[in-house]
């Protein structure tokens, strides 16, 4: 069985994320969407448990996708779970420059390969950070987020 992981903070999960997850699910027998702690990002709008619930709801139509969370080294998770590849979406060359050293380190530490998928152009401008910012100022990002996430982000901003 070929297994892949799609790691990220997913705060919140966007349509761009779902596109990458869906494309990974077409190429692998099992895909784990892994909510990870990123020390370079603030604590986030949504708790880890909220993110897990929103991702589970948003990916329920994918029969070979599961959702988990992890706070340690990604390669420790891949090794412990027999995962063959890490799948990451790239929007721009800046994403590549950020992701490449991590991919090389993961390869060196555990021999796990990283598969880069180019973002579908219709999602290339979407980021979780941008969606949160636009929502805080009253903008509508509902077409950039899964329905449950669009509702949840509006509720978060109201509270």
Curated annotation (Swiss-Prot):
Its cofactor is Mg(2+). ATP binds at residues 9-10, 17, 89-91, 99, 123-129. Keywords: ATP-binding, Coenzyme A biosynthesis, Cytoplasm, Magnesium, Nucleotide-binding, Nucleotidyltransferase, Transferase. Coiled coil: none annotated. GO terms for cellular component: cytoplasm. It comes from the Bacteria. It is found in: Cytoplasm. It is an enzyme of class 2 (transferase). It holds the Pfam family CTP_transf_like. One of its GO terms (biological process) is coenzyme A biosynthetic process. CDD domains: PPAT. Pathway: Cofactor biosynthesis; coenzyme A biosynthesis; CoA from (R)-pantothenate: step 4/5. Reversibly transfers an adenylyl group from ATP to 4'-phosphopantetheine, yielding dephospho-CoA (dPCoA) and pyrophosphate. Belongs to the bacterial CoaD family. This is Phosphopantetheine adenylyltransferase. It comes from Corynebacterium diphtheriae (strain ATCC 700971 / NCTC 13129 / Biotype gravis).
């Amino acid at each position: 069985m070929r297994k892949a992981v799609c790691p990220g903070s997913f705060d919140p999960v966007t349509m761009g994320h779902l596109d990458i997850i869906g494309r990974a699910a077409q190429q692998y027998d099992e895909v784990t969407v892994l909510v990870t702690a990123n020390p370079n990002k603030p604590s986030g709008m949504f708790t880890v448990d909220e993110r897990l619930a929103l991702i589970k709801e948003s990916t329920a139509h994918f029969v070979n996708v599961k959702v988990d969370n992890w706070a340690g080294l990604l390669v420790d998770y891949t090794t412990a779970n027999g995962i063959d590849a890490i799948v990451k979406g790239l929007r721009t060359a800046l994403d590549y420059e950020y992701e490449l050293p991590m991919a090389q380190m993961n390869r060196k530490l555990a021999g796990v390969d990283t598969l880069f998928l180019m973002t579908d152009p219709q999602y290339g401008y979407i980021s979780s950070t941008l969606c949160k910012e636009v929502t805080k100022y009253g903008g509508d990002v509902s077409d950039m987020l899964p329905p449950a996430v669009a509702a949840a982000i509006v509720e978060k901003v109201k509270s």
